[in-house]
Amino acid sequence: MKTGSILAALVASASAHTIFQKVSVNGADQGQLKGIRAPANNNPVTDVMSSDIICNAVTMKDSNVLTVPAGAKVGHFWGHEIGGAAGPNDADNPIAASHKGPIMVYLAKVDNAATTGTSGLKWFKVAEAGLSNGKWAVDDLIANNGWSYFDMPTCIAPGQYLMRAELIALHNAGSQAGAQFYIGCAQINVTGGGSASPSNTVSFPGAYSASDPGILINIYGGSGKTDNGGKPYQIPGPALFTCPAGGSGGSSPAPATTASTPKPTSASAPKPVSTTASTPKPTNGSGSGTGAAHSTKCGGSKPAATTKASNPQPTNGGNSAVRAAALYGQCGGKGWTGPTSCASGTCKFSNDWYSQCLP
């Protein structure tokens, strides 16, 4: 299927949130949906034991396999809808600012990335970022206009892999199944590299439990601040893979700085109404552990700072106070000044700070 047909099918069904849709390699944009296994819409996965937790509910699969040299700076781009923003004043692109949480990247070695299935694969984590100095990985993604970066480990064996990018939104994670998982997989071929064979692999489903401290968690401190109450945040999943001494591997996105990086392209298909969200306050859940939002490199070196993408940053606009909220959008809560009715679904109370349009 041609990319244009994929775009039309995906954009027509998109409604809210975010979707992984592009890869860059050493600053070179690989193209919209090239090498990407794409879901039918940008809705989250909420069941950690569902098969959708692997690569999402894939309905479109591109045949390209992207070449990634070992040690390359790899970017993964997220947008509210395929192509990025839902419109010129889409304040929720690349994702609603209320959707705080971590970002991770996993790899699984495969024989043929274009045709392999996703069940039974062994995954190892090559990048992670959580909460650091009051800022979440999602905050840096938004500041970077949808791009997040990591360094491909220099020591992993050459060959084909599935690359699983994941963003977890924790704004409503105080109750079980409240965390929202946004996931996508890319098909890559690593060139160069070494012979390291990661031992700390995990399976999906199975790597996460619904009660893990980084998944069932109240991230709100005093006055509704999203600082996890000043406590460290424990990133879900296995320990970050690192190369033996002398090689580099395992990294985390750094704070955004201004530079020139790949620019997402816009889809020509019509866009649905965007979802407006703001900071809710769940009433239960807990967070503990030792969070890790810094880079991990063997040999003591640090990854390059994340750079700011050149695609335009949408501005907050529109008359949200008079329009209905989209499915999964916020429709109430203390201090909420946006829509209080739902274009689809029913406005359901979650806690004093957050009500949401649900099916």
Curated annotation (Swiss-Prot):
Q: What catalytic activity is recorded? A: [(1->4)-beta-D-glucosyl]n+m + reduced acceptor + O2 = 4-dehydro-beta-D-glucosyl-[(1->4)-beta-D-glucosyl]n-1 + [(1->4)-beta-D-glucosyl]m + acceptor + H2O
What InterPro entries has UniProt attached to this entry? AA9, AA9_LPMO, CBD_sf, Cellulose-bd_dom_fun
Question: Where is there biased composition of kind Polar residues?
Answer: 307-319
Write out the ranges of the annotated region (Disordered): 244-320
Q: Which cysteines are joined by disulfide bonds?
A: 55-185, 155-243
Q: Where does Cu(2+) bind?
A: 17, 99, 182
**Used how in biotechnology?**
Lignocellulose is the most abundant polymeric composite on Earth and is a recalcitrant but promising renewable substrate for industrial biotechnology applications. Together with cellobiose dehydrogenases (CDHs) an enzymatic system capable of oxidative cellulose cleavage is formed, which increases the efficiency of cellulases and put LPMOs at focus of biofuel research.
* Alphabetic keyword roster: Carbohydrate metabolism, Cellulose degradation, Copper, Disulfide bond, Glycoprotein, Metal-binding, Monooxygenase, Oxidoreductase, Polysaccharide degradation, Secreted, Signal
According to its UniProt record, which protein family does this protein belong to?
Answer: Belongs to the polysaccharide monooxygenase AA9 family.
Question: What task does this protein carry out?
Answer: Lytic polysaccharide monooxygenase (LPMO) that depolymerizes crystalline and amorphous polysaccharides via the oxidation of scissile alpha- or beta-(1-4)-glycosidic bonds, yielding C4 oxidation products. Catalysis by LPMOs requires the reduction of the active-site copper from Cu(II) to Cu(I) by a reducing agent and H(2)O(2) or O(2) as a cosubstrate. Degrades various hemicelluloses, in particular xyloglucan. Active on tamarind xyloglucan and konjac glucomannan. Acts on the glucose backbone of xyloglucan, accepting various substitutions (xylose, galactose) in almost allpositions.
Protein name as annotated:
AA9 family lytic polysaccharide monooxygenase C
> To which species is this protein native?
Neurospora crassa (strain ATCC 24698 / 74-OR23-1A / CBS 708.71 / DSM 1257 / FGSC 987)
